[in-house]
Amino acid sequence: MGNGGRCMVEVVILLVLMAMSQGCDAQNTTGGLTRKSFPNGFVFGTASSAYQYEGAVKEDGRGPTIWDKFAHTFGKIIDFSNADVAVDQYHRFEEDIQLMADMGMDAYRFSISWSRIFPNGTGEVNQAGIDHYNKLINALLAKGIEPYVTLYHWDLPQALEDKYTGWLDRQIINDYAVYAETCFQAFGDRVKHWITFNEPHTVAVQAYDSGMHAPGRCSVLLHLYCKKGNSGTEPYIVAHNMILSHATVSDIYRKKYKASQNGELGISFDVIWYEPMSNSTADIEAAKRAQEFQLGWFADPFFFGDYPATMRSRVGSRLPKFTEKEAALVNGSLDFMGINHYTTFYTKDDQSTVIEKLLNNTLADTATISVPFRNGQPIGDRANSIWLYIVPRSMRILMNYVKDRYNKPTVYITENGMDDGNSPFISLKNALKDDKRTKYHNDYLTNLADSIREDGCDVRGYFAWSLLDNWEWAAGYTSRFGLYYVDYKNRKRYPKNSVQWFKNLLASSS
């Protein structure tokens, strides 16, 4: 999924609390939810990413990525697996498209592998990569399924990391722009919805602060986990370069392709909702601060031309500045907001210096601690992942927050879902009984529908994570988010109960 382990900067706290978590079975109930609960034209789809789905890492000229190197490094993936095969969608995409069509899905969100288009990140285009995505796009459209295409879902060509440390160098802005424009030229006549980046916040924090994602840079705990990196500066540099990359590409698209292709460009932001641990002023302010260091960090520049004032004051000179020209380029360059929302945490103020001394990172800069428990009680039922607690009400609260803070922007829910564990002791028959998942989607969608119908939020689509069980980054194959169960011995797909639930929802008209 987009965020596999997004809260791992607080992993020590979570592991201590994990044993206290409680679970309960959920019933498969629709609660009267139908397509008519949403506006005409509202889009339903599933989401995926190239690295988690495709496999075929050495086929048809694809170059290596930072995740290929990271996944093959001992100790980085919890089950010592890799995505060399993943769920083999590179060879099975026609089968998977039929699964989407059978459910009645309107759209499919997938990502393009940069290193399939440019094996070395720059230079000569790999025609085999262009051909593959043309086949995928055409096959989707032939079944009436609209492609929503992510240009960057974490799989940076390793060549660019080796050449100039990737997102830490401003050269990446130019190279990314060339890659993006190549995609506009090749696919833009049919692709009308582009997502330039998936969860840039997760990239900045997990890859350059905690070091738990590729390329695995950090300085927390005196470089105990990472050999290279600076957790106090690099996340902010990476974020800045990603924001400028989007703005640059948006400018290119609007000047050269918008008139003829009539598409839109957005970003998928990862957003945990934060509730104050208590009614104290300090905790209320802490929850606001945590959100500004998450969504505000990446969204505010596109709506206000700069980072939140809270970040400016707390991060100081370590937070890069936009020139006047850059601010003008960034401000207004977002056509829509993609929101990846899974869970909710309690947040409390923490003005102590312990975390600052131990970590000296973005978490320390927020002066907050976020956990899923209050007074020994979990904030909601837990899924399999230690960070994923089910709090459906937060979907509506979050949509209203986005509406109020950013003046009612166009929003797509580009990821939402929950996982089960991958246990050898659970039979296939029982693994397909995912009533907890159907309740999750029902309850989050119900709150989403209320935010649109009753609160006036401009939300235009919902993408479930995910169509298939898949390779979940640092969690490997231990986590199953799919509507379809995948047997990893032969990659065969089996429909879980949630598939029928979505079929019923999407076929309903009253």
From Swiss-Prot:
A beta-D-glucoside binds at residues 52, 153, 198-199, 342, 415, 465, 472-473, 481. It holds the Pfam family Glyco_hydro_1. It catalyses: Hydrolysis of terminal, non-reducing beta-D-glucosyl residues with release of beta-D-glucose. GO terms for molecular function: beta-D-fucosidase activity; beta-galactosidase activity; beta-glucosidase activity. Disulfide bonds join 218-226. Residues 1-26 form the signal peptide. This is Beta-glucosidase 34. The lineage of its organism: Eukaryota, Viridiplantae, Streptophyta, Embryophyta, Tracheophyta. The gene is BGLU34.
